[in-house]
């Protein structure tokens, strides 16, 4: 006996960053949301920073899926996200002041681990302790993301569902706080965190969160089976993935496409198309190896051009991003671990006016040549990039929406990226504006 569904299931797209984050995922998620009925965050926390420019108005989102800017689209925060209720409501209130309806459209998994004040305190105190001891800082955002994931893996985390049971929450919180205050005061020489303050704030947030709590896994599976197209919105980037990134200079979650299934509660067969977002050059925030890094602080250099014209400052932290040439060997690694279906190249317009462009196709490592990024920060630190030189272009590409309107040199640059990485370019972004996008192949129709 064979079951036959009466409605065709929806098609789903996963959007991931292929570099060290800040690739422009937010704009592309917003653009693709026009063809989807639900947008899902599946990992990370409010350390993410997605900037959208709609009708000239800039909006920065850190926790809520970018689809919130499209009326009628449902937004989901999956179990793979670590949730700061304080930051969530700060973001909700900001959107509501701008006239965006949020609460009736946002569904939050009851299985999300909570980020509480002691997590951020641990994050900040550890970085200070490393610096004082002469150890390199990891470069965390200080938001408590890592410590919250530690509690999850150690099976002691407080989760969103615990907020429904005040007595249970209080008992778990007291035990957890005893542990973390011991570390804060005895090892990191930082102040203790007060139980009553944390508990009272959590109970205030509990009442506000209850209407949005949901079995996100079931809702996503039901919606897709009934024909809804879903968009899974990755945060950070592949080279910040805790397993596949430049460890230990990474975030504390899996940023790769495969985690969209585990972090949202859907089967891997529901991930139909994987779109890798990559800048037309490279950037990185914080410490860690960066083979193609340029001098981005000295005026009248290419690196300075990328930094200033590209407005390369972090959305979440405001820190300057390090800048460098495009790294196709790095992108090969990202394509491999994500199973990319296609690429979207962002910030092509930032390269306007650069006379000569360099593209890294591989590295020299300990006397040998490799055409793919090695595993591990120590090996990557020793990599010497091997460059191809390509002609730049003087014409402006800002706002171009048709591929054949791009300068010939820009087309050649993009074609070479495809050749070296083996991944087709399906979309190109030519400014932060939602409408300044070239579509070569629609992920929802591919």
UniProtKB/Swiss-Prot annotation:
Q: Where does Mg(2+) bind?
A: 22, 49
Q: Which cofactor does it need?
A: Mg(2+)
Q: Name one GO molecular function term.
A: GTP binding
- Provide the residue positions that the database annotates as binding GTP: 21-27, 49-51, 321, 347-349, 429-431
Subcellular location field: Cytoplasm
Q: Which UniProt keywords apply?
A: Cytoplasm, GTP-binding, Ligase, Magnesium, Metal-binding, Nucleotide-binding, Purine biosynthesis
- Which InterPro entries is this protein grouped with? Adenylosuccin_syn_GTP-bd, Adenylosuccin_syn_Lys_AS, Adenylosuccinate_synth_dom1, Adenylosuccinate_synth_dom2, Adenylosuccinate_synth_dom3, Adenylosuccinate_synthetase, P-loop_NTPase
Q: Name the active site residues.
A: 22 (proton acceptor), 50 (proton donor)
Q: Detail which positions bind IMP.
A: 22-25, 47-50, 141, 155, 236, 251, 319
Q: Where does substrate bind?
A: 315-321
The principal localisation class reads cytoplasm
Whom does it interact with, and what assembly results?
Homodimer.
Database matches in PANTHER family: ADENYLOSUCCINATE SYNTHETASE
Q: Report what the protein is called.
A: Adenylosuccinate synthetase
Q: Which organism is it from?
A: Polaromonas sp. (strain JS666 / ATCC BAA-500)
